[in-house]
A protein has these predicted regions:
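Hydrophobic transmembrane alpha-helices and immediately adjacent juxtamembrane helices
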Residues: 1-259
Length: 259
């Protein structure tokens, strides 16, 4: 049992490091992890005076929006890039579980992009002189861990969905801005048309943002964070099932192009 856990941890760590090394050569990583959060935060927070609690809400919305974008373009593109480079079959048919490999790569992408986004946001906060309210730092750390877990699971799911179509790159671009508008982050759900207010409830990052909104006013409301965790589990289970179906289909056809 211990040997199997050690092997699984080694597989995840190796995949994580491989993905992080590959990210160093991709210009898109700089765009989604540095340029985008800096631009969004400068536009949203730099054009008006904000109270400390309101600044916390704005920073949370911008950071989570940037993490969504980074998830789509980095973790969400893991398997699509493998297919482009011709290494997909080796990644998903080795002696190790393809789910573990994908988890490690998605986790590596999520950690790197999240670190870049947080660092970029911190620089802008200092330059703009924003006062950010953090009344419960430990709970904020818990929320950050949920964000990393959720981004990893969501990245795995998107990677599997993008894999089963030759138009994954187009879908990546198409998914960005609808969530910017309908994700309940930059635009509050109550500002959306009544018939669209259910959309943000499907996004775990929206629930993390709701939790942070409560924290900024001094209230600890575990319910939104619990919903985010539940959605993360749903994303992960769906991703593993989707990957298994995709790989099995490729094996039956004798090809891992899958489409």
């Amino acid at each position: 049992m211990n040997e199997r856990l050690a092997t699984a941890a080694w597989v995840v760590w190796t995949a994580l490091r491989a993905e992080q090394q590959g990210m160093r050569t991709r210009p898109m990583v700089v765009v989604v992890s540095v340029v985008q959060p800096v631009a969004l935060l400068a536009i949203v927070a730099g054009t008006r005076r904000l109270t400390a609690d309101r600044a916390s809400v704005v920073v949370s919305a911008v950071v989570l929006t940037a993490i969504w974008s980074a998830t789509v373009w980095t973790a969400g593109g893991v398997l699509r890039r493998e297919r482009t480079y011709g290494t997909l079959a080796r990644s998903v048919t080795s002696q190790f579980s393809p789910s573990l490999v994908l988890f490690g790569r998605s986790l590596g992408a999520t950690l790197s992009s999240t670190a870049g986004i947080l660092a970029s946001a911190a620089v802008v906060i200092v330059l703009l002189g924003l006062r950010v309210a953090v009344p419960h730092p430990l709970w904020l750390l818990v929320a950050l861990l949920v964000v990393v877990a959720s981004g990893t699971a969501l990245g795995m799911l998107l990677a599997c969905l993008f894999l089963v179509t030759r138009h994954g790159l187009a879908w990546s671009g198409a998914l960005i801005y609808p969530v910017f508008i309908l994700g309940g982050l930059l635009i509050p759900p109550d500002a959306l048309p009544q018939w669209l207010r259910w959309v943000p409830t499907l996004l775990s990052l929206h629930w993390v943002h709701e939790f942070v909104v409560g924290l900024s006013s001094g209230a600890v409301r575990p319910a939104p964070l619990a919903v985010a965790v539940a959605l993360t589990v749903v994303y992960l289970v769906a991703a593993v099932a989707c990957l298994r179906v995709a790989v099995d289909t490729g094996r039956r056809r004798g090809s891992l192009e899958l489409v």
